[in-house]
């Protein structure tokens, strides 16, 4: 008597029908991106941007740290850190602010710039492009940079795309036709998928007329309207946005204050940890999990300016907001003032160091099981989880929370394996040995 009941020819009918669905899911959800995600984006008005902006911000951040937290104990008290953790991270924060104070900068033609006469915005678009080109020549750009244009609403659509074109045209003229590494355009206040489609079309057109390689221009979405959470028919809006933007979309950034205002929340209660914000961020996570699109949280708008106790209160609030983001799976956020950089890195470093031992055990065990399964011919279909565990170490190492040597020691991986940035490739390398 046969061990199974369903005949093979009958089984094949519905098993084969799964092919299209499984392929579609694999294409839509490739897993976490192995590329380096910045831990923050620093925003600054386009009229203020200079080629040496990153180093100047670093100097101001170091000055703030030296003045308001000159030692680990003071920093621990100011932002509520375990003193032992503060001892471990303090020199690392100083080193980061000296070596690479800004990971990502956004030249802002929207809220940070305001509404100005057309000739004025035209001029600043070209001046900002000149400064970026100069920074490219001088080697003073942060690892990632971009511009935020105005929304593609009826009021601003032509103004927005003119700034996009003016900036890029001048930049390519002054940079021998090259874009900066990791250049991105930020599209704000999206209310309809057609706006995302138009942004993608503008990128297509610019690349065509300037003879740029297809896909060179990438953009990120601001999620700061209720229409970017749910569409008018009640469906989640982000999948449609992503479909319209295609492979050009690299990130989705949450806009705390516009979103809470759109929800009718009064100014006194518009802040990062409002339950309405958690809801929106969780919708973003569910909609974009596994797509490889980065998520970024918003900004703390209480600036660390004034007497020592005022700065310390602002620092503690900022550190709490950063930690809230990290705990909820948002590994990037916005900084609006140079004195927020010390607390950004302190909070991020503390977060990664606190979870390092547990992450180390999980990754070591996971790699062993995955390699064994593959070695004996079994199908290992959880590479996405492995990439997520690997990304913990890559994030910690990239931002400066741990050194490459510490990552090798804790992860059980070799330098070559870590630098591959790919869990699947690590498995292949181990099987070949």
Question: Across the structure, where does each feature detected by a protein language model lie?
Answer:
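Expand to "…catalyze enediolate/carbanion chemistry for C-C bond making/breaking, isomerization
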Residues: 1-433
């Amino acid at each position: 008597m046969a061990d199974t009941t369903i005949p093979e020819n009958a089984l094949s009918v519905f098993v084969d029908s799964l092919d299209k669905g499984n392929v579609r899911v694999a294409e839509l959800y490739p897993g976490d991106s192995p590329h380096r995600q910045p831990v923050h984006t620093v925003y600054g008005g386009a009229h203020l941007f200079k080629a040496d902006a990153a180093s100047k911000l670093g100097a101001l951040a170091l000055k703030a740290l030296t003045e308001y937290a000159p030692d680990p104990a003071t920093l621990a008290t100011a932002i509520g850190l375990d003193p032992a953790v503060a001892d471990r991270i303090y020199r690392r924060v100083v080193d980061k602010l000296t070596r690479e104070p800004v990971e990502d900068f956004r030249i802002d033609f929207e809220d940070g710039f305001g509404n100005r006469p057309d000739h004025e915005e035209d001029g600043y678009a070209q001046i900002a492009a000149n400064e970026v080109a100069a920074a490219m020549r001088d080697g003073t750009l942060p690892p990632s940079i971009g511009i935020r244009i105005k929304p593609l609403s009826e009021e601003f659509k032509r103004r927005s795309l003119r700034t996009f074109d003016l900036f890029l045209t001048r930049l390519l003229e002054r940079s021998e036709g090259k874009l900066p590494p990791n250049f991105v355009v930020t599209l704000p206040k999206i209310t309809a998928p057609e706006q995302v489609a138009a942004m993608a079309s503008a990128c297509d057109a610019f690349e065509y007329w300037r003879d740029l390689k297809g896909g060179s221009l990438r953009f990120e979405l601001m999620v700061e309207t209720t229409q970017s959470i749910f569409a008018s028919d009640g469906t989640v809006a982000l999948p449609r946005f992503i479909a319209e933007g295609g492979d050009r979309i690299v990130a989705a950034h949450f806009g705390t204050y516009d979103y809470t205002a759109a929800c009718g929340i009064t100014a006194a209660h518009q802040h990062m940890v409002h339950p309405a914000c958690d809801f929106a961020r969780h919708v973003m996570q569910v909609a974009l999990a596994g797509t490889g699109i980065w998520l970024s949280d918003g900004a703390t708008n209480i600036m660390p300016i004034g007497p020592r106790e005022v700065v310390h209160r602002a620092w503690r609030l900022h550190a709490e907001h950063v930690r809230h983001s990290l705990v909820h799976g948002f590994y990037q956020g916005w900084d609006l003032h140079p004195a927020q950089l010390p607390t950004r890195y302190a909070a991020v470093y503390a977060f990664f160091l606190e979870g390092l031992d547990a992450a180390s055990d999980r990754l070591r065990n996971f790699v062993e099981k995955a390699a064994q399964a593959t070695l004996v011919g079994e199908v290992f279909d959880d590479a996405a989880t492995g990439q997520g565990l690997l990304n913990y170490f890559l994030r910690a190492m990239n931002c400066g929370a741990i050194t490459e040597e510490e990552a090798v020691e804790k992860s059980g991986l070799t330098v070559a394996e870590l630098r591959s940035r790919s869990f699947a490739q690590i498995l292949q390398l181990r099987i070949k040995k």
